[in-house]
């Protein structure tokens, strides 16, 4: 990191599958549109629009951004003297935090001046980050707990049939369950590809036709598998 605090506005028109890794600094994300999946250990948390999630230094995690997702990220260097939260979890995005992030997004990140107005905003965000109260007691604060088991099934590649679960999950993701299921298939395909599998091998391991993978690749990944 060039500065002690840095801001990035991420735009993902297509599925983005991050690798599992330990964070080299503390950071938080706030989803503006779409949804980000955060894997911590065996659990995967859904960060929907308007929701924030904090990840501390040295935290093993993986991020997946669904197609059409925009989110803000603020990174805090280990050089920062301000104490920050040492636990991962959801946090409440206050109107002030939302306004500060929106203000930062009006200017390209590479044009931000540490000694200018952007630097002052980032320092205010650092103060707010020091006060965050986080929790991982829920898989998604936007989804009623009775639907969490269905959400877990989908994220693990299974299908759901209960209408109430389908309606609740679709309202949070703002896309159909079938679209979400297709994204999960392609996420696993990407992971297998990264481990050296060829398309035919991936299709066999996922028990799907190779033609289906080819059909899903362009609209979901923006490129062939």
List each language-model region with its residue ranges.
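Short acidic-glycine-tyrosine-enriched beta hairpin
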Residues: 41-57
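Generic protein-terminus/edge-of-domain signal
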Residues: 1-35
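An amphipathic alpha-helical interaction segment
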Residues: 93-166
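Ligand-binding loop in jelly-roll beta-barrel domains
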Residues: 59-90
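A cytosolic small-molecule/anion-sensing beta-strand core signal
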Residues: 32-33, 48-49, 67
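Pre-recognition alpha-helix immediately N-terminal to the DNA-recognition helix
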Residues: 184-188
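Basic/polar phosphate-binding segments, predominantly the helix-turn-helix DNA-binding elements
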Residues: 152-181, 191-225
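Short beta-strand segments in beta-sandwich/barrel cores
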Residues: 33-39, 52-53, 61
């Amino acid at each position: 990191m060039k500065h002690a605090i840095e801001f990035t506005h991420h735009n993902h028109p297509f599925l983005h599958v991050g690798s599992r890794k330990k964070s080299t600094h503390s950071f938080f994300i706030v989803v503006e549109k779409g949804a980000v999946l955060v894997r911590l250990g065996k659990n995967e948390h859904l960060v929907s629009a308007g929701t924030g999630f904090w990840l501390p230094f040295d935290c093993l995690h993986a991020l997946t951004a669904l197609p059409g997702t925009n989110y803000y990220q603020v990174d805090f260097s280990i050089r920062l003297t301000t104490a920050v939260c040492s636990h991962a979890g959801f946090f409440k995005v206050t109107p002030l935090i939302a306004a500060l992030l929106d203000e930062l997004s009006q200017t390209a990140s590479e044009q931000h001046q540490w000694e200018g107005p952007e630097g002052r905003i980032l320092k205010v965000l650092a103060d707010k980050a020091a006060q965050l109260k986080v929790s991982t007691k829920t898989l998604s604060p936007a989804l009623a707990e009775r639907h969490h088991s269905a959400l877990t099934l989908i994220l693990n590649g299974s299908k759901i049939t209960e209408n109430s679960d389908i309606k609740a999950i679709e309202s949070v993701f703002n896309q159909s369950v079938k679209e979400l299921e297709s994204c999960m298939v392609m996420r696993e395909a990407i992971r297998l590809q990264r481990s050296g599998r060829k398309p035919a091998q991936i299709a066999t391991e996922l028990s799907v036709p190779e033609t289906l993978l080819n059909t899903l690749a362009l609209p979901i990944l923006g490129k062939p598998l």
